[in-house]
C-alpha cells in the first residue's frame, strides 16, 4: 500500500493511523509467531514487516504517524519509520519483544534513528509502557 501510494501523483502525504482510539498498532500477532516452525517461515514473517518499515522510510512522499492509544512492538517501529510522528498525551509505547524471548531487531534501526542508542536500550529493557513524552524527550 505504501509503495502504491508513493507512486500515485494524486497523493502528496501519507498518514499512518489506527481506526480506533485505544490502539495504534499492537505489532505482530503472537499466535502467528508461535506457529513459525522453520527458518524460512521465520524469515518470511519478519521480512514482511521489515519491508513495510523500509517502504515507509524510503517513501518519497511525506509520511506522518498519528499515534492514539498503544503502540507496542512493531507498532513502535511503524511510528518511528514515519517522517513526522504525533502522539496524543495518553499514548503508550512499549517494546515487548524481550518478554517473548526475541529482540526488537526488525524495528531497531528505525527506532534507534529516531531516539538514539541510549533511549533505544532503555525502551527495550523496560518492562512497563512509556508515555508518549518518552519519544518527545528522546527525539
Show where each model-derived region lies.
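A short acidic, glycine-rich active-site loop
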Residues: 35-47
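Alpha-helix N-cap/helix-start motif
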Residues: 23-26, 42, 75, 104
Amino acid at each position: 500500500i505504501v509503495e502504491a501510494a508513493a507512486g500515485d501523483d494524486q497523493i502528496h502525504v501519507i498518514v499512518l493511523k489506527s481506526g480506533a482510539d485505544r490502539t495504534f498498532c499492537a505489532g505482530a500477532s503472537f499466535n502467528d509467531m508461535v506457529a513459525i516452525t522453520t527458518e524460512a517461515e521465520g524469515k518470511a514473517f519478519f521480512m514482511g514487516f521489515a519491508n513495510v518499515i523500509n517502504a515507509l522510510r524510503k517513501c518519497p512522499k511525506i509520511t506522518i504517524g498519528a499515534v492514539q492509544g498503544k503502540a507496542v512492538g512493531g507498532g513502535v517501529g511503524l511510528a518511528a519509520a514515519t517522517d513526522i510522528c504525533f502522539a496524543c498525551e495518553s499514548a503508550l509505547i512499549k517494546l515487548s519483544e524481550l518478554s517473548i524471548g526475541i529482540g526488537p531487531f526488525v524495528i531497531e534501526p528505525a527506532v534507534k534513528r529516531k531516539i538514539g542508542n541510549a533511549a533505544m536500550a532503555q525502551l527495550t529493557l523496560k518492562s512497563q509502557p512509556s508515555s508518549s513524552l518518552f519519544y518527545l524527550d528522546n527525539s
